[in-house]
């Protein structure tokens, strides 16, 4: 891709991100689960927007998981355990401007399968 196409792609994602985030709000009882995917790894965190703090997070890079659907399902199961340890049963899913497809969808489905209501 040339520079102009990359700029447009990032600008469109940023617009989607702002539009989504304007409608979502997480608190201590129902935090916002924000995901980030790079070309190689996958990350997620539970955010309390009222206090502007992270409740818990998971880092696929440190755990040796790649950016694949199978690894996203495993990360989702581990992250669901972390949320349950923190006393969280419900959350708001923030896909962070990414399309609900592939690893982003697999992670969300894994959270749902492991008892987190999104």
UniProtKB/Swiss-Prot annotation:
Q: Which GO terms describe its cellular component?
A: cytosolic large ribosomal subunit
Biological process terms in GO annotation: translation
Give a GO molecular function annotation for the protein.
Answer: 5S rRNA binding
Q: Give a Pfam family name.
A: Ribosomal_L18p
Keyword match rRNA-binding: yes
Can the keyword Ribonucleoprotein be found in this entry's annotation?
yes
Print the keywords alphabetically: Ribonucleoprotein, Ribosomal protein, RNA-binding, rRNA-binding
The cross-references to CDD domains, in alphabetical order and at most eight, read:
Ribosomal_L18_L5e
Q: What does this protein do?
A: This is one of the proteins that bind and probably mediate the attachment of the 5S RNA into the large ribosomal subunit, where it forms part of the central protuberance.
- List the NCBIfam families: L18_bact
> What protein is this chain from?
Large ribosomal subunit protein uL18
* Biological source species: Helicobacter pylori (strain J99 / ATCC 700824)
């Amino acid at each position: 891709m040339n520079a102009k196409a990359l700029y447009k792609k990032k600008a469109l994602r940023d617009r989607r991100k702002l539009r989504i985030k304007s409608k979502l709000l997480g608190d201590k009882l129902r935090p916002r689960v924000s995901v980030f995917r790079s070309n190689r790894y996958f990350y997620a965190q539970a955010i309390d927007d009222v206090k502007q703090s992270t409740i818990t997070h998971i880092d696929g890079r440190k755990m040796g998981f790649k950016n694949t659907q199978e690894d996203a399902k495993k990360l989702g199961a581990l992250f669901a355990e972390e949320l349950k340890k923190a006393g969280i049963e419900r959350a708001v899913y923030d896909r962070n401007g990414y399309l609900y497809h592939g690893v982003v969808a697999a992670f969300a489905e894994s959270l749902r399968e492991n008892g987190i209501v999104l």
